[in-house]
Amino acid sequence: MNDTLPTILVVDDEIDTCRNLQDILADLGYRVDVAHDGPSALELVRHKHYDVALLDYLMPGMDGLTLYREIKKLSAGTVAIVVTAYAGGTTTEEAQKAGAWQVLPKPVDFPKLMGLVDEALGQPLVLVVDDDPDLCANMWDLLRDRGYRVAVAHDEREATAQLANEALRVVLIDMKLPTGDGAKVYRLVRRVNPKARAVVITGHRSEMEEKVRQILAEGADAVCYKPFDVPNLLDTLARLSGERNGDGAEGAR
């Protein structure tokens, strides 16, 4: 089986719905796993990355929104599409607050759902490597609102586990991490996923000046300083996410 194929998780307590979605998505070339409840879905997510999760809103025990909040803790880059017989009104608002990308009514319009899956997979994937959970949460909200998929890592170990994802377009790397350092993570990016673009970030401009200069000389694409100039950060990400490495690096400040 081709491990580079997009992976989809379908979670619904209706067995026939799961079977139909699994058959359709598999025929389209996706790798598909199925779970019929929240705990089973979380067990799958603990051992495997999913690009998109299709989640039933109402299920016995853990509902789809509670499930997605837990999925985000394990796999922030997974995009959620919620399906429900109660679409609209407060359901849509609650889903958006939980971070779900789209809400679809049941019975499912399969062509529309397939279009949304394709659209979700086309969103550039950005990995934020920073030990500050509040910054990561804010970046997740900011970038998701602008159409990026956003994965998160808080240290070198967590980053290393995600760097091999071939969908990865840009990695934002904090220069100070609790284990390892940003320079080491940058070099891992170049070794493990050389097509990904790399932006170093730091709130310690003077202290990190020499290290930043060295990393830029090694080929990092840009540096952004904290507190972020948000328009500049977004412009940098927009430029880099549309490129693949090999087009020439530019240090943007």
Regions found by a protein language model. Name each.
Residues T66, K73, A87-Q102, K184, ...:
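Alpha4 helix (beta4-alpha4-beta5 surface) of REC/receiver domains from two-component response regulators
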Residues V34-V52, K73, V152-V170:
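Acidic, metal-coordinating helix/loop segments flanking the phosphotransfer/catalytic sites
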Residues D56, T84, D174:
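Active-site residues of response regulator receiver
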Residues I15-D33, P133-A151:
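Two-component/phosphorelay signaling modules centered on CheY-like receiver
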Residues C18, P60, G88, P178:
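The feature encodes the CheY-like receiver
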Residues V83, I201-G203:
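Hydrophobic/aromatic residues positioned on beta-strands within the core alpha/beta folds
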Residues D37-S40, D63-T66, D155, D181-K184:
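Acidic catalytic/metal-coordinating carboxylates
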Residues E14, D51, Y57-L58, L65, ...:
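The short loop immediately C-terminal to the conserved phospho-acceptor aspartate in CheY-like receiver
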